[in-house]
Design a protein with these regions (language model features):
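A short, Lys/Arg-rich alpha-helix, primarily the initiator
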Residues: 1-18
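The alpha-helix within a helix-turn-helix
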Residues: 16, 27, 56
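Short alpha-helical DNA-recognition segment
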Residues: 20-38
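DNA major-groove recognition helix of helix-turn-helix/homeodomain DNA-binding modules
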Residues: 48-69
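Short acidic DE-rich linear segments
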Residues: 71-75
Length: 75
């Protein structure tokens, strides 16, 4: 049986990896614990719509805005 949450989780993990963002970086950006982000990526938790739309933006700009935001907030 096709499991939508697992497929979605794999897709968002691939987006994060392609943008060369770590779990910790992206968790910080989203304001969630790294364990929560891992649960999204494994399909154990449903991804909130707001976070899912952010993944689309990350895919479109290859994580540039996220990296910029992280650098501004860690400086």
């Amino acid at each position: 049986m096709y499991d939508y949450k697992i497929k979605l989780g794999r897709n968002i993990k691939e987006i994060r990896q392609n943008a060369r963002l770590s779990v910790n970086q992206l968790a910080y950006y989203f304001g969630v614990k790294p364990e929560t982000l891992k649960d999204y990526e494994s399909g154990n938790l449903s991804v909130p719509t707001l976070i899912l739309s952010e993944y689309i933006d990350i895919k479109n700009d290859n994580g540039k805005e996220v990296k910029k935001w992280i650098n501004q907030h860690l400086s």
